[in-house]
């Protein structure tokens, strides 16, 4: 890091692992949160099972494809910029999913979610590498990985609860809210 570069982490050290964990779990969480609503979304949008599968495939393709580039973008433009732009795009895409009136719109916005959701996962690992010596980085990475593994377990329960009580649109509004909160936290602390 160059001397004139501002510090990457401006908050308390204990909070870094929590923030990086939430950044890392955004991708898997947004995959599994809407899975319980597949049949409800299909009925509401008049979509076939294949079309519903495309909402997941579009997300995964965008997620995998952009994982190739998020690291290089973060090296070129800075960790903070890539995370903030990624979360902002994720938030807009989540709102787009909630407002989708047909399956084509939903597939498009799910692809945008995928393109942007991976930024947190890639950059969180780069931040750990930047801030910690190797032995300490392993400990922080193990904490982050635990939360990363928890996301797919709790996401369907959250999505199912939202579906039952508030309808399928609420799942994507919830993800929009998560995006807004995550953006604000990163804007303040990263």
Regions found by a protein language model. Give the residues of each.
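Cytosolic juxtamembrane N-terminal segment immediately preceding the first transmembrane helix
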Residues: 1-27
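Small-residue-rich transmembrane alpha-helices and their cytosolic helix-loop interfaces
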Residues: 24, 56, 60, 141-149
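Residue-level signature of mid-helix packing/kink "hotspots" within the transmembrane helices
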Residues: 32, 60-68, 152-153
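Extracellular/periplasmic helix-loop-helix junction of adjacent transmembrane segments
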Residues: 37-65
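Interfacial helix-cap and linker-helix signal at transmembrane-aqueous boundaries
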Residues: 41-42, 73-74, 161-166
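Conserved MFS/SLC helix-loop-helix module at the cytosolic interface between two early adjacent transmembrane helices
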Residues: 65-104
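Helix-loop-helix hairpin linking two adjacent transmembrane segments in secondary transporters
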Residues: 105, 142-188
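Cytoplasmic helix-loop-helix junction between adjacent transmembrane helices
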Residues: 109-148
């Amino acid at each position: 890091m160059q001397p004139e570069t501002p510090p990457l982490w401006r908050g308390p050290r204990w909070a870094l692992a929590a923030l990086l964990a939430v950044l890392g779990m955004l991708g898997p969480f947004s995959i599994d949160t809407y899975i319980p609503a597949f049949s409800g979304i299909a009925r509401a949008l008049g979509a076939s099972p294949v079309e519903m599968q495309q909402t997941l495939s579009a997300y995964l393709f965008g997620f995998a494809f952009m994982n190739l580039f998020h690291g290089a973008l973060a090296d070129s433009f800075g960790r903070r910029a890539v995370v903030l732009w990624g979360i902002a795009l994720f938030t807009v895409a989540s709102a787009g999913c909630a407002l989708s009136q047909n399956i084509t719109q939903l597939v498009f916005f799910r692809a945008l979610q995928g393109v942007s959701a991976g930024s947190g996962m890639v950059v969180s690992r780069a931040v750990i590498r930047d801030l910690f010596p190797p032995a300490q980085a392993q400990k922080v990475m193990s904490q982050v990985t635990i939360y990363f593994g928890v996301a797919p377990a709790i996401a369907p329960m959250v999505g199912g609860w939202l579906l039952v009580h508030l309808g399928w649109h609420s799942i994507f509004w919830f993800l929009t809210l998560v995006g807004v909160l995550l953006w604000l936290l990163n804007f303040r602390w990263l």
